[in-house]
């Protein structure tokens, strides 16, 4: 807005507001039912979308009447790498949910081989002396890519340059990858724990000058 000489609007929230909000955060485990107010109970279940993502079950009681409301952002698919499958909620009186793909049906019978497809592209590009640049969301997608790249390295699918280096040049993606590489039993699926996203020839850089 400043470059376009447009009116600069004041932020709705300040850094101080954010710091004060963080002090009020209370953590809880998936599947734990909490009484957060009179007549209000909540329970978080794994949404299988991003690390720590959750759908929320709410039981609202007024007098003798109890209604169940479910709220959720994105819900993940089954059999995805790293993140556990979503826990499905079977009943509710009202549901509020993110619906980017609400008018599509995912074909769960197809089992695309992402590792082989990506390996073929990387193998051809490196064999021709090039580099592969993959734009990716810092949290979730980057770690999935690193997981697939680890698989192709272990299976020897990139024959032109078997020991090729992998560089993550986003500070946020690098920090997220370090979190994914920690002790996350109960949050990652067993395959991801057995084959983490951190491996030889993987580098994360905070600034461009380090590339």
Residue spans for each PLM region:
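Hard-cation-handling environments
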Residues: 121-203, 209
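Core dinuclear metal-dependent hydrolase active-site scaffold
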Residues: 20-84, 209
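Functional cores that coordinate and move charged inorganic groups
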Residues: 56-59, 65-148
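Glycine-rich nucleotide/cofactor/substrate-binding loop typically near the N-terminus or early
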Residues: 14
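Conserved small/polar residues in nucleotide/adenosyl-binding loops
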Residues: 3-10, 200-207
């Amino acid at each position: 807005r400043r470059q376009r000489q447009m009116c600069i609007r004041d932020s709705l929230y300040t850094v101080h507001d954010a710091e004060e909000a963080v002090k009020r955060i209370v953590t809880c485990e998936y599947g734990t039912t909490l009484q957060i107010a009179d007549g209000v109970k909540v329970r978080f279940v794994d949404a299988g979308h991003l690390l720590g993502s959750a759908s929320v079950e709410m039981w609202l009681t007024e007098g003798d009447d109890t209604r169940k409301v479910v709220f959720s952002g994105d819900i993940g698919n089954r059999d995805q790498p790293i993140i556990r499958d979503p826990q499905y909620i079977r009943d509710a009186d009202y549901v509020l949910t993110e619906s980017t793909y609400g008018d599509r049906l995912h074909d769960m019978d197809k089992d695309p081989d992402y590792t082989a497809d990506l390996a073929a592209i990387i193998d051809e590009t490196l064999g021709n002396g090039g580099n592969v640049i993959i734009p990716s969301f810092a949290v979730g997608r980057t770690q999935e890519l690193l997981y697939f790249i680890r698989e192709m390295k272990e299976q020897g699918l990139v024959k032109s340059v078997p020991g090729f280096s992998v560089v993550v040049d986003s500070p946020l993606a690098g920090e997220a990858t370090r979190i994914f590489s920690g002790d996350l039993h109960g949050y990652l699926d067993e395959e991801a724990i057995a084959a983490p996203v951190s491996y030889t020839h993987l580098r994360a850089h905070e600034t461009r000058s380090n590339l």
